[in-house]
Curated annotation (Swiss-Prot):
Function: Required for endonucleolytic cleavage during polyadenylation-dependent pre-mRNA 3'-end formation.
GO terms for MF: ATP binding; polynucleotide 5'-hydroxyl-kinase activity
GO terms under cellular component: mRNA cleavage factor complex
Source species of the chain: Chaetomium globosum (strain ATCC 6205 / CBS 148.51 / DSM 1962 / NBRC 6347 / NRRL 1970) (Soil fungus)
Segments for region (Disordered): 1-20
Protein family: Belongs to the Clp1 family. Clp1 subfamily.
Protein name per the record: mRNA cleavage and polyadenylation factor CLP1
Keyword Nucleotide-binding: yes
Gene: CLP1
Amino acid sequence: MSIPGLGQIAPQQPTTSTTRTITLRPFWEWRFEVPRSSIPTTNAAISAIGLGGAGAGGGGATVRLTSGTAERDGTELALNRTYTFPRNTQSKLLTYTGATLEVSGAFVDSVAQYPAPEASPQLPVLNLHFALQELRAAAAAGGSNHNNNNTNGGGAPGPRVMICGEKDSGKTTVARTLAALATRAGGQPLVGSVDPREGMLALPGTVSAAVFGTVMDVEDPAAGFGVSGTPSSGPSAVPVKLPMVYYVGRERVDEDVPLWRDLVGKLGSAVRDKFAADEVVREAGLLLDTPAASVAKGDLEVLTHVVNEFAGGLLGAGRTAGWQLTVTVNIVVVLGSVDLHAELQRRFENQRTVHGEAITLILLDKSDGVAERDKDFMKFTREAAIKEYFFGDAKRTLSPFTQSVSFDDVAVFRTPDALERAEVSAEMSHWTLAVMNASVNDPPEVIRQAPVMGFVAIADVDEDRRRLKVLSPVSGRLGNRPMIWGRWPEPYINLLG
């Protein structure tokens, strides 16, 4: 289908008031970007970028819904509550019924108008949600009529959706929106990400999955996928999620494909176990975000591997006899790439899941509101996530535990090619290390594929005294837990500087 994006108007011009009122009609979107630093204050520059509100150089945008309904990536805003969006936020607010917003602060914004709901890029996503809800209802009905002693938990589980597309195609936004809509409908879907570039409910450089059964944080720069949605030593604005996390320690999959494959397999096994143990989660299904992929770059094997790992030997690659996996990707959503859709359709057209289902390919147009994220944006996002993990944000201040430990009391492993014990040195300063749920006496392959317990930051290395200053989110000795020093995220930052 075509999404023309008709009626998009020029960015709003500045006003003399610090607060503006924006009126949205049904299916209109208010799109905004809070810059990383100050906004130009000359009249010409302001006119060029459309400064929302006054007070250039402010640290964020504030929004209040005064009438109607509005949501951010599927999570509703409460009426007459003030929301603050921090620096480096790129997002939108959508209304299905019409809404009035009061906005203030320093940001770039515009209103996307559509002559009819059919022209909105959100309508296909909403229709997809309703179709998934029908599949969830069918799974619930099938499960209730099946013998509960079956180890597979009944018939086919709810929909298992893999979302893919090229770089900056809106994959994560669609995954987040579908998760929020499913949660609002009373479901508890499993949501996963096998893209190490950003991290979901964890620091960048990881793959993870978690049950989403509660509301997401509207004010989170990642709209509910950030580290603010996980347990911490301080209060949380929303109920926290409990992710299963595996540490890749690389930015891109192609930097270490064998390692990524192994960890995706571990994540698939964790998802399988959760489906087997929790009927409610099983009925809600899976929503899986994937790394950017294109036919031209030869990324198809990455997506094929994801389907294979979450499909119980669907493609018959390297599975032992008796391999059973209840989590089977049966829906592949492709955003904005006709070539990618056609190639995946060709690869999967004759395949069936372990439940006898055909794999459905769905092509959705890329939203005209998707923002392109440059290297500076991604670097700021990574550093902000690390800082928030240890120190919290504007709503929640955390005080990391600082301890001085001897070189002899820690076990650090590094990953140049294979995992090996590393000598502690000044080079380690300001890096973030993953603490693994394993023992230092375990074989290297066990340590490398173990789940992540948490992260620590090396604030300082004193080679003369052979001491490390370590920041951790909670108090407690590191004990015999091995730590992995990866290649990424970098460049590293001085959290205490």
